[in-house]
Design a protein with these regions (language model features):
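Hydrophobic/aromatic residues positioned on beta-strands within the core alpha/beta folds
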Residues: 116-118, 280, 300
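Short, charged/polar "capping" segments at the starts of alpha-helices
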Residues: 37-40, 121-125, 183-184, 285-289
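Structural beta-sheet core signal
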Residues: 30, 113-115, 175, 279
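N-terminal beta-alpha lobe that positions the nucleotide/phosphoryl donor
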Residues: 341-344, 349-510
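Conserved phosphotransfer microenvironments
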Residues: 9-10, 39-51, 62, 67-113, ...
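Non-catalytic signal-transmission and effector/linker regions of two-component phosphorelay proteins
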Residues: 1-66, 102, 130-137, 141-220, ...
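As written
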Residues: 97, 127-138, 289-298
Length: 510
């Protein structure tokens, strides 16, 4: 029996991006000596560094930092204000920070506690002998302010992942690594890449508001520090797993297992799920295990590790351009940049290439990585063997894109862009001013049709004409630039007014 859906029965619902990422970190309590606070700030305020990081990535709601130096001050702040995260910086002369964390955890068990410490062999030995049961994460401060952003986003992802994956299918990237120093370095690179990609994909949104909301649908990152934690996270999110990055050697059953990453890869492969897997190791000889798992391999000792990681994620996890390959030679046939480009080129993809990419879920991953969940969900559940031929596959992909674009365009006032306005566009504006009465009325009807789909039926379609509205600020610019207000509001006759208006130049935006 074919698993291909009947598109007439399939109704796409707009993704409620506004309901995603509802739990955020607004206030951070930093417990550190004055010297450690100064070292962290590096002659600049923590708030300013975080604000700059958020701004550079078009993120909103940067948290505020409150700094204290003692446990008593921390408990007093916690009594009087709400904090979503506590960061502790232990000093070698102050051995009570872990005891303080345990005491705080007793009174505030739901607030995550992170230990942030400079890296040294002495610190590593000390942490190995400490009771870390009250600590959620330990990070090594390497002088990079991007680590603070990564810590905040990691905690936010942990808080929001259960609801966001269940409600709309937000994807998960799992990093398995037990080296504090290494994941403290890798996570900032990983987050910066994912956030930059999401920022780029969000440009396909129809207006600034939708662009901001769509970034909430970016893939979330989860960190596992031992085999059991990796299996637990994988089992919980296996249906939403965009990809996995795993070290080769980490803790398994309480002891260091040099083949834990390989064993975890085997566990993943036994599920039969098609999930990209990147195996990392400090020993180049372990690439043979990656090959056996049909995984990519990265040498952790490589000086180009950040670039290698970015390249593998770009290739395997659905980010960047969709490169259509010849399955026999692995040569590039064509490159697809965005949704509209895929719609235009899908009928040009050769049969064998289409089978190759469909059988590996590359199309659904292309949609998932861009937070286009409705078409991704459909394609994910259609097996390549369900298609009677590849023409049927091409038609399904094309029709899904058309239906998705129509759904996204309905009831939305888009910003007019010449290269994007086509037969599937509904309503766009030029300018930032008021739509005016007629334009606002049409926009209202479009919004009602989207909000109440039962208004439409097979026998009675409700829609609005394709519309481009020139906003009032464009009209004002036209009038002021050409000095037409005195003419229009004066005593001149109609023929004179008409002559002045016909001579006038339109604003360059038109």
């Amino acid at each position: 029996m074919s698993g291909i859906p009947n598109l007439k029965d399939l109704v796409f619902r707009d993704t409620p991006f506004a309901n995603l990422m509802n739990k955020r970190i607004y206030n951070v309590l930093l417990i550190a000596t004055k010297y450690d606070s100064f070292m962290l700030e590096d002659d600049g305020r923590v708030d300013e560094q975080i604000f700059n990081e958020y701004t550079s990535l078009s993120l909103r709601y940067p948290p505020r930092f409150t700094q204290v130096t003692t446990e008593e001050e921390a408990l007093n702040e916690l009594k009087n204000r709400n904090f979503e995260l506590i960061i502790c910086m232990p000093n070698m002369d102050n051995r009570d920070i872990f005891a303080a964390a345990s005491e705080i955890k007793v009174h505030y068990p739901n607030i995550p506690i992170v230990v942030l410490t400079p890296f040294s062999k002495e610190v590593s030995k000390r942490i190995a002998n400490e009771d870390l049961s009250a600590i959620d994460y330990v990070f090594s401060w390497l002088g990079n302010s991007e680590l603070l952003l990564a810590i905040i986003k990691l905690i936010e992802d942990k808080m929001n992942a259960p609801d966001d994956t269940a409600s709309v299918g937000v994807q998960i990237i799992l990093l398995v690594e037990d080296s504090i120093r290494f994941y403290s370095s890798a996570l900032p690179h990983l987050y910066k890449f994912v956030l930059e990609q999401s920022q780029m994909f969000a440009k396909e949104a129809l207006n600034d508001h939708q662009r901001t909301l769509r970034m909430r649908g970016r893939p979330k990152i989860k960190l596992a520090r031992n085999y059991e934690e990796a299996v637990r996270i994988f089992d919980q999110y296996r249906d939403n797993m965009l990809g996995i990055i795993s070290d080769m050697s980490f803790m398994h059953n309480g002891v260091k297992d040099p083949y834990a990453g390989y064993k975890f890869g085997q566990y993943v492969r036994k599920t039969g799920l098609i999930i990209p897997f990147v195996l990392e190791s400090s020993e180049a000889s372990n690439h043979v295990y990656a090959k056996e798992l049909n995984a990519s391999f990265i040498d952790k000792n490589s000086k180009s590790y950040p670039q290698d990681l970015k390249k593998k994620i770009m290739q395997r996890f659905g980010f960047g351009d969709f490169v259509i390959l010849n399955p026999h030679t692995k040569e590039e046939i064509m490159r697809i940049k965005d949704l509209k480009d895929l719609q235009k080129k899908v009928f040009q993809i050769p049969d064998d290439s289409l089978v190759y990419h469909l059988s590996r879920n590359h199309f659904s991953r292309f949609f998932y990585s861009r937070a286009m969940f409705p078409p991704a969900e459909v394609l994910k559940h259609v097996d390549v063997s369900d298609y009677k031929d590849m023409d049927e596959a091409r038609k399904l992909i094309f029709d899904l894109i058309v239906q998705y674009r129509r759904m996204k365009n309905t009831g939305v006032v888009a910003v007019y862009q010449k290269d994007r306005f086509d037969e599937y566009s509904n309503f766009a504006r030029i300018g930032d001013g008021s739509l005016g009465g007629k334009g606002r009325g049409l926009a209202f009807i479009g919004a009602m049709v989207k909000r109440y789909p039962k208004l439409e039926s097979d026998n009675f379609a409700v829609n609005i004409p394709k519309t481009v509205v020139i906003c009032t600020d464009i009209f004002d610019e036209f009038m002021e630039t050409n000095e037409l207000y005195p003419v229009a509001l004066g005593d001149a006759d109609d023929e004179t007014i008409l002559r002045y208006f016909l001579r006038a130049s339109l604003p360059s935006r038109l």
